[in-house]
Amino acid sequence: IRLREFNMAELEYFIDPDDPPIDDLSKWPDRVCMVPDPDGPRPGEFEMSFKEALESGIVKHPTVAWFLAMTMEFLEFVGIDRTKVRFRQHAGSEMAHYASDCWDCELKGEHGWVEVVGIANRTCHDLESHEEHSKSSLLRAWRTYEKPVKKKSEVLKPVGSVIGPTFRERAGEVSSALSQLQEIPSSFPFELELPDGTIVHIGEDMVNSAVEDSVVSGEYFTPHVIEPAFGIDRIIWHILDHNYKEVDKEGERYTILSLNPEIAPADLVVLPLFDKDGMD
């Protein structure tokens, strides 16, 4: 459906891919309608809890399952009829290339099933793309080990008598860049990128290879991101659709809108029982 406004509420939720937060999904025991990837191993429509969906592998990530459960809880709180809710997994052919899993929450109303929420596991695509183009590693996070680890690592030590005359005023930048190499090149010469993007070529005579012992307390990693996106206007439209009704009582037509007091625009209203001059 097309509405006059298109307001979105989005969250970028960053997690450690090796240690994702895992919530107790048994807090949401009720079953909901799940529609897995039609091209996957379990096509069809199923009634299951979020815990069952995760344990069966239909939902691929615990944090995604948690957001699905929280979405259902929120929609019920604001007045959505749970019998008119389903969660549909994107088919492989429609999923964005950077996502490893993506689910839409759809609500049934006057215009059929309409997407109102999208929850995507965007993995590390965004931050790695930013790092690639900005040449900055500032968006990495630090993971502390439970116990410090002894580690042997190969390093390249600059030969000052060669680096200095070759690169002159930039010799310090070259030496610093060499000390920060994450992977040691397998052959010479190799290209080395400086902080400003300049590429220099390092020959075998410019460095000495050495093995150093160190005690490491942790490591930097690129966080993954789970992104829930809520279509505010579509949700409001379906709140009205699910809670508006007209009933006949004793020959009269009554129009009723039942809203959760938490979201109702007014706590109460006082109205006259009949129309009469001077009573309004």
Each language-model region and where it sits:
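NTP/phosphate- and nucleic-acid-binding module
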Residues: 1-280
